[in-house]
Structures are given as C-alpha cells and as structure tokens.
Amino acid sequence: MQCLLREKPRSLALVNKDHALMFHSVPQNKNSLSVCVAEFTALSEKPLEGFRKISSHRIYGTLGLIELEGSNFLCVISGASEVARVRDKERVFRIMEVCFYSVNRSNWDHIRQENYSPDIPDGYDTDTQGYDSYKYAAEPFSSLRKLLTNGSFYFSLDFDITTRLQLRTSQTMTEPQYDSMHTQFMWNEFMLRQLIKFRSHLNGDEKSALDGCRFFTCAIRGFASTEQFKLGIQTIRLSLISRLSSLRAGTRFLSRGVDDDGNVANFVETETILDSSKYCVSYCQVRGSIPIFWEQEGVQMFGQKIDITRSLEATRAAFEKHFTSLIEEYGPVHIINLLGTGSGERSLSERLRQHIQLSPEKDLIHLTEFDYHSQIRSFEDANKIRPMIYSDAETFGFYFENNEGQSIVVQDGVFRTNCLDCLDRTNVIQNLVSRVFLEQVMIYTRQNAGYDFWQVHSTIWANNGDALARIYTGTGALKSSFTRKGKLSIAGALNDLSKSVGRMYINNFQDKGRQETIDLLLGRLIDQHPVILYDPIHEYVNHELRKRENEFSEHKNVKIFVASYNLNGCSATTKLENWLFPENTPLADIYVVGFQEIVQLTPQQVISADPAKRREWESCVKRLLNGKCTSGPGYVQLRSGQLVGTALMIFCKESCLPSIKNVEGTVKKTGLGGVSGNKGAVAIRFDYEDTGLCFITSHLAAGYTNYDERDHDYRTIASGLRFRRGRSIFNHDYVVWFGDFNYRISLTYEEVVPCIAQGKLSYLFEYDQLNKQMLTGKVFPFFSELPITFPPTYKFDIGTDIYDTSDKHRVPAWTDRILYRGELVPHSYQSVPLYYSDHRPIYATYEANIVKVDREKKKILFEELYNQRKQEVRDASQTSYTLIDIAGSVAGKPNLIPHLPANGVDKIKQPSSERSKWWFDDGLPAKSIAAPPGPEYRLNPSRPINPFEPTAEPDWISNTKQSFDKKSSLIDSIPALSPAPSSLARSSVSSQRSSTSIIPIKPNKPTKPDHLVAPRVKPLLPPRSGSSSSGVPAPNLTPVNVPPTPPPRKSSASQRSGDLLASSPEESSISWKPLV
C-alpha cells in the first residue's frame, strides 16, 4: 500500500495494486466545517494521473482524518512491528510510526516525518527519540504524532482486535464488520467515523473490494505480546492483550472515578489466550477505578488527599450504569478491592460497600476486600486471596474452542480488580487470577505446566503492568520486579523509588499537556468536529435507487402465525387444533411456536436440559400442521432451539424453502445473573428473500413486584443476543418477541377477579406492569402490541376456568404476550381455552411484505446511474469543488443534500454562496429559477411591486404588446434622440436632463424599480481607440419593438439596474426573480 499526492487540484490517494481511495480538497470558508470529497475507484477504470509518491515507506492503513488548525490531515501508519500472533493467521502489530498528510494544504509536504527503522528493537522507547525537536515544533500534528508513536497503540490486519475471542468467533476478516467493532476500545473511532460512514454508502461489490484493500485500520491502546514454548510435545502460544477504554481516558490525576455515563478511569480489559493445534482458550478480566465521583490532587509531595465530590444519592445513577453495562457484557461481577485502611482509601471502600448494598444488581455483584499492603510481604502471601476467589473462578469458567472452531465452554462472569490507581497492586493480583484460570485449563486439558511456563507467564504480566502504568502515569509499574521474580529485592525497591520520583514530576508538569493531546485524538475538545467526508456520486445513486426500487425488486405478502404457551411441564398432546387453527383463520406460510416450562425447572434440568420433551412437542405440532394440508405442499421444520424450559420452533411450507436462507439460532441466559438457564430467551433469525425476520421467545423473572428484574432481563437479552457477524435482534426488518414475560397487574386479587367477570379489561390494562414500563420507555422500545381483548392468561386452577384458589391467591395477569416491531400488518391477537396448564395459550397472526431483489437488475441500474453521474461530474468540471456543488443540481437533478451532515453540529450552517443561502430551507436556490414562457415574452411592468397584492395583471406580456398605463404612455411620447457630438455629450445630456419637455422628472419615491419601468436599452459602449477622450458618447436609443428609453440616470439605484440589464445581452439569459 502506498500514499500518493497530486498537487493540482490537490488530492491524496491510498493505493494498492488494484484500487485507490482518494481524498480531494475542497475550498473552505473561515467558519465552515472541515470537508473533503472521498472517492473509491478501481485503477483499471480510472488510472491515476498527476500523482506522485509522497512517502517511500510501506503504508499499513489509515487511522482516519482529523482537522488541525484549519487543515484536514490524513493519518497513515508508516511503521509497525509484529509483537503478537494470537493464532496462526492472527497477527498483532505495534504502531511505530505515523505520518500526517494534509488534504488541502501543501505547507508540510517538504517535512520528512518517518523516523522509524525496522532495525529499532521492539523494546525501544520511541518517546525518547527526540522527534519533537525545534524543527517540528510548528507542526500542528506534532503532539498527536508523539502520542501515537510512543509504543502503546496496536492494530491488526487479520482480526477485530477491539473484541475478545469469545465474541468474535463468528467474524472473519474476509468480511470485516466495522459496525460491530467495540468502540469502547477503539481509540481512533473519532478519526475513522466518517470513513466507516463512507463505506456504508458503497454497493456490495465496492464494499467487498474496499474491505479487501484493508485501507481502514482500527487501533487499540494498551498492551499485546505473545510467547511461544513447548508444553509436552505441543507447541503453545501464550498471548496477552490489554485494551484500555477510550471512554474516560486520561492521565493519572486528571482522570479519576466515574463519569455520569458510568465510564470509569483506567478501565482495562485484559485477555489471556492459550493457543495450540488442538484448542484455543481465552479468559478475560477487567480493572478500573472505583465507580464513584472522587478526585485527588497531584501537586502534593506525599499523601495526596482523596476527595469524594458527590453524595451517595447523587452517585447512584452513575454507579448503576457502570455495573449494568458490566453485567450485560460479561455476566456476574466479582470485585476484588485492594484498597487499604488509610483514611482516604477507607472512605472509598466504605462508599463502595454502601452502593453495592443499595444496588438492585447486588445479587450479581460479589465483593472481596483484600488489604494488599497489610497482607502481602512476599509473592507467596498473594496466594492468601485464592480461597476467596476460587469458587467464583470455577463458576465463571473460561472460553474453550476446539480445533474446528466450535465453542465448547463459554465464560460467564468476570473478576473486576481495583486499587487506587488500578496499576501496581492490581497487576500482581490479576497475574494471580490469570494463573488460577490457566491451572483450570491444565486440568481440563490434562496437561502439566512446569516452572518455565509459569516464568514466561509472570514475565509477560510484568511487561503488561509496565505498559499500562506508562500510559497512565508516564513511568513503568511499581513492584514489577515482584511480579517477574516473585520476590522483593533492594534493587527493585530502588527502582520503585526512582519511578515514584518520576511520576511526581510528570504528574505535576506534563499531565495537562498529555491530557489535551488525548482529548484531541478522541475528539473531545470544545468545538472539535470530525472531517466531513462527502461522496456526492454515491449519495445521488443510492437516492435514485431508493426511488426506483420497483424496477429491480418484487413484493409479496407472507402470512405468519405466532403462538406461545407456558406448559407448566405438562406432557405433549396433539389436541391443539383450537390454538393452532382458529376459526376464520387461513393456514399461514410460517408457524412460529414458543413454549415455556417445557420441562419442570428442577436443578437437574437446569444444569443439563433434556431435549426429549422438545422433540415430542415438535413432532405433535408438525403432525397437526401436515394433517391440515390435504392438498399442496406440506410443512417442514425449519429450525428449533431450547434453553432449559424455553423452546422455540419454526415450521414453514415446503414451497417457502427455496426463498429462505441464512437461518441462525442463539440463546441468552438471565437466571442467576446469566449463569443459569431457568430464565432467558431463545432466538431464531433468517432471511426470506431479501427481508430479515427474527423471532424471540423468552421467559422472564417471576414475582409480583419484580418488574425491575424483568426490565433487567429484557435489557440483558436485547443487548446480549447476538448472531453471526455481530448481528443483533434489531438488525432485522421484522421482529416478533413473545413468551411468558411475567409482568403482572398492580391490583389485588379481590379487585382483579370481579373486573374480569364484568369485562372491565380496559380498566385492568391501565394497571398492567408491561404497559406502564413500555409507556415510560424502559422496555421494548419501538415494539407494538395489538389491543388485548381476552382475559388474563394466568393463573388458573389446572383443568378449570377458575383463577387461582390456592392459599397464595396469585393475582390474575396477562403474563403471556406477543409484541412486534417493524411494518408487520397484524390481523388477530387472542387466547384459547386449553386446560393442560395453569396458563392459557395465546396466538397472533401477521402479514409481512417480503422484498425480493433482482441483484442483476440492481447492479445494471447502479452502474447506469453511477456512470451517468460520473459523466455529469466530468462534464461540469474537473475540480473537486464541483463534486461538492454537483451533489446539489446537475442537469436539472434535485438537490439531494442541501446541507452538510450535522453530526452533532447542527448549530453551524453551511456558508452562503452565490447559489445557496443558509437561511433558505430545504436547499432552495438563492436565485429565482422562474423563466418567461418564451423569448417573445417579458416581465409585465404593470404588476404591483408587492408580489402578494391581488391583481389581474399577468406575469408575462408579449414584446409586441403595448402597455397603456400612465408611465408607459408618457414614455411612448418621447421622440427618439440623435447622438450628440462627443465634444458636446456632457452638456447635451445635461440639457436633456433639465428639459421637462423631453424627459419627465422622476418622482422622489418611485412606485416601481427602474428596471421594471424602463424598457431595455442598448448599453453604453466605451469610446473606440480613435474617438475623442474628452467626453462620453451620447447613448444610442434606437428602439427595437419597444418604445424609446431615457438615458441612464446617475443615481446608484438606477446605475445598478442598468448594470443588471447590461450584463445580459440576451433576455432569455436573465435570472428572473420575483420581487419580495
């Protein structure tokens, strides 16, 4: 990959052997947003002309675009070294050198930016190379360049480095999923944002070609390393990847505690990966600052005071956000708090305990307090924490994948370790937790790890601690010799003292500048906006394709039947006709059936669910469906899934099978904080032609008052259900979510039962918990439900129509529901009186509009529109400015993008130009586009000056038609004037102006502008070279089909009118504009 430059018109290009990604400069006003035009093209279609190499180095990709001091810079990686190889084809590189090339200015073209040499050893601290010397001081990108090349940034060309192994098992770099990358750990997200948006505008073939070029590079900050060694007869790779969060990034004393969004300082996800030819194992743990609002001054010599800045009540929201996101991402959380008993650290620990006790997630949060300084005197003392964490370590498990890429075991839960800075003490304990995990792996794989293995493990963890400490404090980690060698020494103590002095200096004198550079990289400075990437050709083509969709697509309607039943563990039966085949309901094309409590939720079933019951019900449902098909194709089972007692099965007509593809299934546990499958959801998705459908059945937390826990179950399922390539349930055209939601009616048994008997369902629905939670937006946003016209479906005495008569007297409720999202057409929603369970089954019918795209027709139309638009651009001009302008109107095409994309900066309007004004809505043109019906027509001077005043006068009149209003009659009586001699021109004109018998005196306040009252005149010509220069020639007023016109007056108003007419020798070329 190379970076090329064209100077006139200025453009940059990233080029490989087949394609080019070009960035064209755009003229900008002082207060306008930063904009450049992007273009992706095949070199075979558009050879690069006028480009030259701007760098002799290999380019590894671009980190994105950023605006600095009015210049738009393209940042490219020009130096890198391989530091890790997670698996055979998964390499990790450290960024060693970056270059900033201006898209719109040549000021820095002469500066040589590359300092990195592949001969520099990987451990060399590039921060000390002195690149920021006096000759670079004037560069606007110098601080960013120094940050990006300090050895703490990493990238991969082979896999998504922002995501841990357990979540990226279904991803392949043949089709990178930029939208699913973990932006929390993506440090160049701000710079790359517009490039990813540009990618989304491309068609399928172009997008695949762009992905194959690897032009875009996602960078993390933290640490990555791999050590290879022998374990028995196997070759093993031990890799460590630490990903530092960018959401509350900063330096030691300027970034503490939590923010209002729940993001904590120095949050790091560390993944230990063990890879061999037979398996690949991964284990994740995290660290982060105490999630409360606290600060600490860094200018004191010793004993920096800790200041808790918000009350317990004011901190709860942020605390809950932090742990809610952790639980949704990793499962249950075990906190290892290493703070001591000093006054400052003790106050943080006390506040942490208070928040955990008040948290609604307290059952999913375990706390272990371990005073590191008082407990640990040697490495062996660190083992004191083992009994405190071993139980959860076994429960959480690890991710295990066989050599065929199949997931055998998954990690459910995470250890969260913290001390004050989350550096030195944290690194020692995380090293121990990682060792506990690896010991479990050795037992699982029946292998033995010797001394050399553990020594390599300790060394790689010590290097990790040094790298993270250098990022946060500017120096390496304290106690690193303790981590490496397992003991304290005098040399290690002296080294720690030296680092402490270095930290004090850096914190007091350098942190502010480092913080500003970090904020600049992340796009967090005041009034900082991303560089807008404009792609007018694809914008136009995609807009036209949407308008002409019917030319390459077909539509048909498909009937869908959705049914849900909580079986309460009852046996399978075929007596389900009333449920699956209601009266006056035609057979559907697709049947979606969900069961809850298909088995009794005993501990044995929860641990290992028996699929036999599910198969029995599948057989019963399929037999019933095919029994109804007396003629024509029958029904086949498309797919089924089970999570303990929750089961989902989908049946479709055989005739539908050729249209269905990409069938996938997944599950999400929510019971016991995601560890147990007694509660949770099962989901199946597929594509019907080119329409995506997703069906979810779920069983949420029980309990009359546990609606908060049910809300949490919804959020866990909504965020945790993931299909291949990072697809979520919301990435579909139609979604149906149904099952036993367990939401109750907030009334008493004595109030509800009489209302049911009296048919007061609307009154009861006002107290329905799900209805209330949906109205407040807490659950199921953008989902809909048909009006409920049936009585509550829970809880009955089995075999009767009588609601619960047991001692508990459970309040009847609509626990069983069916919700939908998308433009489905609902037809019915009912319950059915089946008596096998304490629930009543429900069903709903829908009709879905299915779109089938003829890809060949779409491709032909795309190419036709694309080539047509490119030709229009080429005909208009060769400059990139016209590309911007061309997006508005070329050859009468509509203005597709009247304003630049807002991207959070709606207050800044596009600057006005000759063609557009910012105060005109919807991109209306600045000049009127009204034109006379033909060349023989002109504007009617008799119309009132106020365009809103009612009048019978037409807008246009013929050139041959005489106007008989008062002014035109007076003008018609003026005889034609003969040219005066040049020497008498001035006096002649003067005498004409003073003679009322020849020219009437103009009123002080004219009722119409001059250029509407006066007919066209022949413009005054400058004297020829042979004429006298002592005077101005008299005007030639020879009329052409119009009455004669008085000579031009000297008033500024009439002079401007004369200039307007003089600039258009042909009347048809005048930009006609109504007066306002």
Swiss-Prot record:
GO biological process: phosphatidylinositol dephosphorylation; phosphatidylinositol metabolic process; protein transport
Keywords: Cytoplasm, Hydrolase, Lipid metabolism, Magnesium, Protein transport, Transport
EC numbers, comma separated: 3.1.3.36
Reactions that this protein is recorded to catalyse: a 1,2-diacyl-sn-glycero-3-phospho-(1D-myo-inositol-4,5-bisphosphate) + H2O = a 1,2-diacyl-sn-glycero-3-phospho-(1D-myo-inositol 4-phosphate) + phosphate
SMART domains named in the record: IPPc
Family per record: Belongs to the synaptojanin family.
Function: Controls the cellular levels and subcellular distribution of phosphatidylinositol 3-phosphate and phosphatidylinositol 4,5-bisphosphate. Involved in distinct membrane trafficking and signal transduction pathways. Highly active against a range of soluble and lipid inositol phosphates. Active in dephosphorylating the 5-position of Ins(1,4,5)P3 and Ins(1,3,4,5)P4 and to a lesser extent Ins(1,4,5,6)P4. The enzyme is also active against PI(4,5)P2 presented in sonicated vesicles and Triton mixed micelles, and somewhat less active against PI(3,5)P2 in unilamellar vesicles.
Name of the featured protein: Inositol-1,4,5-trisphosphate 5-phosphatase 1
Organism: Schizosaccharomyces pombe (strain 972 / ATCC 24843)
